[in-house]
Amino acid sequence: MQTLDQLDVNGKRVLVRVDYNVPIKDGVVQDETRVTASLPTLQHLLARGAALVLLSHLGRPKNGPEEKYSLRPVAAVLERALGRPVKFIASLPSSEETRRAVESLQPGEVALLENVRFEPGEEKNDPELVEQLARLGDAFVLDAFGSAHRAHASVSGVAGRLPHAAGLLLHNEVEALSRLLHDPARPYVVIIGGAKVSDKIKVIENLLPRVDRMLIGGGMMFTFIRARGGQIGNSLVEEDQVAYARQLLEQYGDRLMLPTDAVAADRFAPDAQTRVVPADRIPDGWMGLDIGPETARAYAEALQGAKTVFWNGPMGVFEFPAFAAGTNAVAQAVAELGNQAYTVVGGGDSVSAINQSGQASKVSHISTGGGASLELLEGQLLPGVEAMK
């Protein structure tokens, strides 16, 4: 990939595609992680004499501009984080008004444009929109790893029209995740959780031949347990994936580790009645909503001595405190490896768990890209990453 050092930015207007797709409630940004993650690239470019024009999407607006999807609240957060004024340009990124506002920027100045998904051509990678966006800068930097798997106008489209490079965040993400695919230090342990096998099939398929152990948790565990003939009560199961899970167990049974116990509930609610039962004997009318304490201990033990670890997806219904113990135990076990192992955590709930455990600093890499991380680990080429080559 082309790196920032290879790009001439002094006195230039640099269009930077960032990922500010952040949760906003009542006009207030709830989580600033993605804004903070973009700072090293922005500071690097400013220090080298660039003026910055920032592009991002927010949410999935369906009918053009909508107030709740405006990036205006993000401008205030960015201004505070950068320690310099950020000019918010409320007109559509493709408009003449925006072009005029951007042309007046001086080196060291920063402008944040309105949500690029307000443009109907963004997700279609419309050539006309690509041209209009390319006019806003002399060079282009892609730093939105979370959007790198999208062939959109502001991601891969503009890259074809301007001198370009990968930002520091994008570069670090690709390097960090590639280490999980190419010559990882062993033992290599992967923890996969979440509700559905179908969401993670390709990652499981691509990683299983490479790992020493794969620990399964979350709702998807019951599809595997059903494949082994277990009783799962009312637990979540994907019937159309049972045969596939059975095939994986036959082929990789020595590497796949399944829960031996589960926290079962009489209904899906935070205040449900609970009991710990064998994972393959969930009583009728009950549902498994977390891995049990015996499994949590076994998984922590399986992680001891690992040299490479990747964790994606919660072990249970992490939003309900009664079913968060499994996820928290895994967060603790991953963090305790410290610098004895190369550890990567990706996926919203796993990242939340590691942050809440107060142990995030002990993890080698926390990935900001949900779908993009998974697609890279599936062995797919990401349009944004390919465009930076």
Swiss-Prot record:
Report the EC number(s), separated by commas if there are several. Answer: 2.7.2.3
What EC class is this?
Answer: transferase
Q: Which reaction does it catalyse?
A: (2R)-3-phosphoglycerate + ATP = (2R)-3-phospho-glyceroyl phosphate + ADP
Under CDD domains, the record lists: Phosphoglycerate_kinase
Database matches in InterPro entries: Phosphoglycerate_kinase, Phosphoglycerate_kinase_CS, Phosphoglycerate_kinase_N, Phosphoglycerate_kinase_sf
> Residue span of the signal peptide, if any?
none
Write down any Gene Ontology CC term: cytosol
**Where along this sequence does the record place binding of substrate?**
D19, Y20, N21, R34, H57, L58, G59, R60, R117, R150
**Primary location class:** cytoplasm
Asked if the keyword Transcription regulation belongs to this entry, the reply reads: no
Give the SUPFAM superfamilies listed for this entry: Phosphoglycerate kinase
Q: Where in the cell is it found?
A: Cytoplasm
Which keywords belong to this entry?
ATP-binding, Cytoplasm, Glycolysis, Kinase, Nucleotide-binding, Transferase
Is the keyword Kinase in the record?
yes
**Pathway noted in the entry:** Carbohydrate degradation; glycolysis; pyruvate from D-glyceraldehyde 3-phosphate: step 2/5
Q: Which Gene3D superfamilies match?
A: Phosphoglycerate kinase, N-terminal domain
The UniProt annotation places ATP binding at K200, G288, E319, G347, G348, D349, S350
| Molecular functions per Gene Ontology | ADP binding; ATP binding; phosphoglycerate kinase activity
Recorded family membership: Belongs to the phosphoglycerate kinase family.
UniProt-listed PANTHER family: PHOSPHOGLYCERATE KINASE, PHOSPHOGLYCERATE KINASE 1, CHLOROPLASTIC-RELATED
- HAMAP family according to UniProt: Phosphoglyc_kinase
Assembly behavior:
Monomer.
> In its UniProt entry, what is this protein called?
Phosphoglycerate kinase
